[in-house]
A protein has these predicted regions:
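Transmembrane helix-loop-helix hairpins at the membrane interface
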Residues: 7-10, 14, 162-265
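Residue-level signature of transmembrane alpha-helical entry/exit and packing/kink sites
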Residues: 40-48, 77-88, 124-129, 179-184, ...
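Membrane-interfacial segments
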Residues: 63-70, 102-111, 146-151, 155, ...
């Protein structure tokens, strides 16, 4: 092996060590809390879709939505806001702790460790994440123009994927961002923290039976779960793989929460 080849391998190793982080605690929970049966594996895959299916039914189905309005006497906007809080702060944040206790027998402290809430990757946040976000921005700008725009237009023309006119997710930013700042702050916590806790902190370990495909399948199912706003989220599938890749590289929940915040801003 020549000196040049040695130097090239050394540089590759340094670059890999910069981006890739090992976490024995992450690996241990990934091994010990795996579903054993085919039914169990299917159930965890189904858990990717259930929150989105619920949101699509209670927001997008006219008969269901009108019934909710009559019962609650809420405005359409605040009824949807209430459902978002239930799903993001309730389902996403609480269900992992409930499932880990009932199905895996973990204590609160063990659940915090499983989810990655008890440790933080400072190098990932302050060194790796800025580089990753810069690369993501370089890819996303042309992607939005040349891929997202035509795909979104196509999906909006499909009746099955139609977003109803009362939806705050109809593509107009004013629909969602017209809420008071304090309400948006609560919602954003549920969004950034809740979705990452549920999809990366909890489910990504549970579906590690997928092997090397796990980092790819996890963000794919995460994108598809947005059933209540298909024309605007499904076209982003080409970009969301960055979430699974970053979790595979750093194995840290807080890095993903920060990245989610960057992407949504």
């Amino acid at each position: 092996m020549t000196h040049t080849e040695d130097e090239h391998k050394f540089r590759q190793g340094r670059m890999a060590s910069f981006f890739k982080r090992e976490d024995p605690t992450y690996d241990r929970w990934e091994r010990t809390c795996q579903p054993k049966s085919a039914l169990g594996k299917g159930a965890y895959l189904a858990l990717y879709f259930l929150p989105g299916l619920l949101a699509a039914i209670v927001i997008n189905v006219p008969a269901v939505f009108s019934t909710e309005l009559r019962i609650t006497h809420l405005s359409p906007r605040y009824l949807q806001f209430g459902w978002l809080l239930i799903i993001t702060l309730g389902w996403h944040l609480l269900s992992p702790f409930i499932f880990l206790r009932l199905l895996d027998g973990l204590t609160i402290r063990e659940s915090l460790s499983y989810l990655g809430l008890d440790r933080i990757d400072l190098k990932g946040i302050f060194a790796v994440l800025p580089v990753f976000c810069f690369a993501f921005a370089l890819v996303s700008v042309p992607y939005i123009q040349f891929v997202w725009t035509p795909l979104s237009t196509f999906l909006q023309a499909v009746p099955l994927f139609h977003v109803p006119p009362w939806s705050i997710f109809g593509g107009d930013p004013a629909g969602l961002y017209a809420f008071p700042p304090y309400a948006l702050a609560v919602l954003f916590v549920g969004n950034f923290v809740g979705e990452e806790l549920y999809y990366r902190g909890y489910l990504m370990k549970k579906t590690s039976f997928l092997g090397r495909a796990n980092w790819f399948v996890n963000p794919l199912l995460f994108a598809l779960y947005h059933l209540w706003q298909i024309p605007f989220t499904w076209p982003l599938i080409g970009l969301v793989f960055a979430f699974g890749l970053l979790m595979w590289l750093r194995k840290d929940l807080y890095v993903l929460i920060a990245f989610h915040f960057f992407v949504n801003m």
